[in-house]
């Protein structure tokens, strides 16, 4: 980009009113203050100096020839913006409303750029050495609803194209020169202008953008829109390659050269972790200082009553269990709007793990009905089996043993396919990464050798062609009454585990064991510990099944079950606390 050649252009920027212009590689004028790219080209005043050229349009000028080796000058934030654009498009293709990309994610990203002092502020961090001041009045709530698109439906430009700013900012803005310090360094160490600086930047109180943060932005946007996609669904869609994440950089335009330090910023070779993305979601929401999110009400997909029904259907459990899960939700207060709604500006900002909580409620109901102590559930199964044999025309009683056998087989098959798919996953991108242009030929040669070896190996083992991408679905297990090979338990009765007492129904099981006897102290990093050997095989299977569905650690689900029990049996825990305090007093 040449600032000297752009000095002749004296018009004010339509976005920030500054008169500070540079030239892109295509010959377009761009504002060095807000990076707004105009449609005006540099005028060619003397064509005699340029051989073999023709004037095709008046006042259009001649596009500058792209240097294919150097490519565009671009910043790291623009790379993340392009990835967010691709992820938003993928979510749109999955059925999410266009408002998520056009309004919600647009405003979240713009607010992040200002809060992190990368754009929409005085002296962005990558244009001057002075510490910039964020203009807080630029992002009023009325401004959020009226601003034009940042991530355009038509294209994703290399620079931020829009964003209305306050009048005070227009009068106080000054032109900033593009930093020359990193130009020679970036040509060797990174493809982006600020790749080296960005990888070394550590500023207290600033949330640094990473690849996992892109998923946090997506989930925040989904949560704001109250879309029918949970965090576990989002991560599963990433795993199934419906949403760009692994090797997302290979979708960059050819002119955006990526090498050197950019490898560590955009290259990632690990699957996103549920707990990590959850924490980053809360972190980003707090950093952006977002207002209270729209209420999660009973008719919202993320409400536990609806999610419980969804997961009961998925794991082939009786529909009658839904009334029991709703009762637990009511008793624990987990269906209250204030409990479910995310409020980043609250004193203790935290959002609910909606999917994990719903599954934990189902586990608690299973313990209430069947105890899950490797004994009582099997005795109830014997009663159900005998009843079903004698009354084949009546509505069948739910048989826990038969359900366990069918689900165990389906679960093992599904998990084996999942493990095989993960083992076969090719982490290397089609677009090789390299540290410098010196390494470029070697990187491409190695990639070519790997592709050839894979083809030869496939021929030797006579492996069938890899199946195409699976169509996205909210369900991983499907159960229907028409399926003759597998029993569908949705319509089965819980009469074998319930007994009538007056006008109410009680469980035949009068016992209950707590998943956690004592919670860890507040300064500990976890709620409780989980060791499989300490629990029954039935309980282990239930946790493993649901953990696989949500792609989470078993210990995380065990913690959530313990928290549900703590709310449900609050009196029992309070009695234990009093006893422990009295013992301490006696010791003194």
UniProtKB/Swiss-Prot annotation:
Which stretches of sequence are listed as region B-linker? 69-73
Extract the ranges annotated as region (C-terminal cyclin fold). 262-372
| UniProt region (N-terminal cyclin fold), positions on chain | 74-261
Pfam families, per this entry? Rrn7_cyclin_C, Rrn7_cyclin_N, Zn_ribbon_RRN7
Query: Which sequence positions carry the modification called N-acetylmethionine?
Result: 1
Which terms are listed as keywords in the entry? Answer: Acetylation, DNA-binding, Metal-binding, Nucleus, Transcription, Transcription regulation, Zinc, Zinc-finger
UniProt GO MF annotations: RNA polymerase I core promoter sequence-specific DNA binding; TBP-class protein binding; zinc ion binding
Entry's InterPro entries? Answer: Rrn7_cyclin_C, Rrn7_cyclin_N, TAF1B/Rrn7, TF_Rrn7_Zf
Q: Does the keyword Nucleus apply?
A: yes
User: Which effect does the record note for changing residue 31 to A?
Assistant: Abolishes Pol I transcription but not recruitment of SL1/TIF-IB complex to rDNA promoters
Stated consequence of mutating residue 34 to A: Abolishes Pol I transcription but not recruitment of SL1/TIF-IB complex to rDNA promoters
Q: Where does Zn(2+) bind?
A: 13, 16, 31, 34
Q: Tell me where it resides.
A: Nucleus, Nucleolus
Q: What cellular component GO annotations does this protein have?
A: nucleolus; nucleoplasm; nucleus; RNA polymerase I core factor complex; RNA polymerase transcription factor SL1 complex
Effect seen on changing residue 13 to A:
Abolishes Pol I transcription but not recruitment of SL1/TIF-IB complex to rDNA promoters
Q: Which biological processes are named by the entry's GO terms?
A: DNA-templated transcription; nucleolar large rRNA transcription by RNA polymerase I; RNA polymerase I preinitiation complex assembly
Q: Where would one find coiled-coil regions in this protein?
A: none
* Zinc finger RRN7-type: from-to: 4-39
Instruction: Tell me the segments the record calls region B-reader.
Output: 40-68
Q: Which residues carry this modification: N6-acetyllysine?
A: 440
- State the function annotated in the UniProt record: Component of RNA polymerase I core factor complex that acts as a GTF2B/TFIIB-like factor and plays a key role in multiple steps during transcription initiation such as pre-initiation complex (PIC) assembly and postpolymerase recruitment events in polymerase I (Pol I) transcription. Binds rDNA promoters and plays a role in Pol I recruitment as a component of the SL1/TIF-IB complex and, possibly, directly through its interaction with RRN3.
Q: Which family does it belong to?
A: Belongs to the RRN7/TAF1B family.
What the entry says about domains is:
Although it shares weak sequence similarity with GTF2B/TFIIB, displays a similar subdomain organization as GTF2B/TFIIB, with a N-terminal zinc finger, a connecting region (composed of B-reader and B-linker regions), followed by 2 cyclin folds. The RRN7-type zinc finger plays an essential postrecruitment role in Pol I transcription at a step preceding synthesis of the first 40 nucleotides.
Q: How does it assemble?
A: Interacts with FLNA (via N-terminus). Component of the transcription factor SL1/TIF-IB complex, composed of TBP and at least TAF1A, TAF1B, TAF1C and TAF1D. In the complex interacts directly with TBP, TAF1A and TAF1C. Interaction of the SL1/TIF-IB subunits with TBP excludes interaction of TBP with the transcription factor IID (TFIID) subunits. Interacts with TBP and RRN3. Part of Pol I pre-initiation complex (PIC), in which Pol I core assembles with RRN3 and promoter-bound UTBF and SL1/TIF-IB complex.
Name of the protein this chain belongs to: TATA box-binding protein-associated factor RNA polymerase I subunit B
Encoding gene (name):
TAF1B
